C-alpha cells in the first residue's frame, strides 16, 4: 500500500521542518503544495503540483500517483487544513500526517497567552453569523479569517449587535 505524507510547513521556512520531514521530501517523487511552500524546495528534482483553490486536481494526482507523494500544508494539516479534505477523499490508511506548529499556536505564543482554554473557529469560506455567535458565546476565541470575513467585518458585526468591550489581537503574516 502506498503512503501519502502530508507534511506541515512551519513558521520558519525550511528550517522549521523536522529532519524526518525533510528526508521524506527528499525521497518523494511528487511534491504538492502552494507556490510559496514549493519554493522552499528549489532543488526538488521530482514532479510538482501547485495547489490552487480547487483541490480536486490534488486528489486526482494523489490517487493516480505510483511513487512517493508528499503534500505540503500549513502548520498542522488536520487543524482547519487540507488534511480533513484529503481524509474525506482518499483512503485514510494511505495518509500519514507530519504536523508542525500551527498559525494559531504561534499567534498565542506571540501574544504570550495560554491557549488551552480557547475555542477555535474558521471563518474562511463560511458565513459571518456563526463566527460572531461563537465570539459572543466564549471568553477566548481564535478566528481564522479570509478576504471576505475579515477581522474588520467581524468587529463591525459585533458592534452592530451591540457587543463591544472585547480585547482583540490581530495576528497576520505569521509564516
Q: For the regions a protein language model found, what residue spans apply to each?
A:
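Short, contiguous strand/loop micro-motifs
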Residues: 8-9, 73, 117-119, 141-142
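Short, well-ordered alpha-helices that flank and scaffold nucleotide-derived cofactor binding pockets
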Residues: 84, 88, 109, 156, ...
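Class I S-adenosyl-L-methionine
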Residues: 1-106, 124-126, 130
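A short alpha->loop->secondary-structure connector
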Residues: 90-95, 113-117, 160-166
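Residue-level "edge-of-site" marker
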Residues: 38, 121, 171
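Short, flexible loop segments at boundaries between secondary-structure elements
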Residues: 103-105, 109, 170-175
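Short, glycine-/small-residue-rich phosphate/pyrophosphate-handling segment
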Residues: 108-137, 146
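A contiguous loop/helix-start segment that scaffolds small-molecule binding in enzyme catalytic cores
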Residues: 2-6, 20-22, 53, 67-69, ...
Amino acid at each position: 500500500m502506498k503512503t501519502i505524507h502530508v507534511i506541515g510547513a512551519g513558521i520558519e521556512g525550511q528550517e522549521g521542518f523536522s529532519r524526518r520531514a525533510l528526508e521524506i521530501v527528499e525521497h518523494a517523487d511528487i511534491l504538492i503544495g502552494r507556490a510559496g511552500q514549493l519554493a522552499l524546495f528549489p532543488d526538488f528534482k521530482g514532479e510538482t503540483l501547485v495547489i490552487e483553490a480547487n483541490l480536486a486536481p490534488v486528489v486526482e494526482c494523489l490517487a493516480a500517483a505510483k511513487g512517493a507523494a508528499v503534500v505540503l500544508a500549513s502548520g498542522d494539516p488536520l487543524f482547519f487544513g487540507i488534511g480533513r479534505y484529503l481524509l474525506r477523499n482518499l483512503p485514510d490508511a494511505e495518509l500519514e500526517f507530519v504536523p508542525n506548529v500551527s498559525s494559531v499556536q504561534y499567534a498565542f505564543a506571540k501574544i504570550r497567552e495560554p491557549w488551552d482554554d480557547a475555542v477555535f473557529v474558521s471563518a474562511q469560506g463560511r458565513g459571518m453569523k456563526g463566527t460572531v455567535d461563537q465570539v459572543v458565546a466564549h471568553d477566548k476565541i481564535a478566528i481564522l479569517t479570509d478576504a471576505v470575513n475579515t477581522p474588520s467585518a467581524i468587529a463591525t458585526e459585533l458592534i452592530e449587535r451591540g457587543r463591544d468591550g472585547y480585547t482583540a489581537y490581530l495576528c497576520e503574516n505569521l509564516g
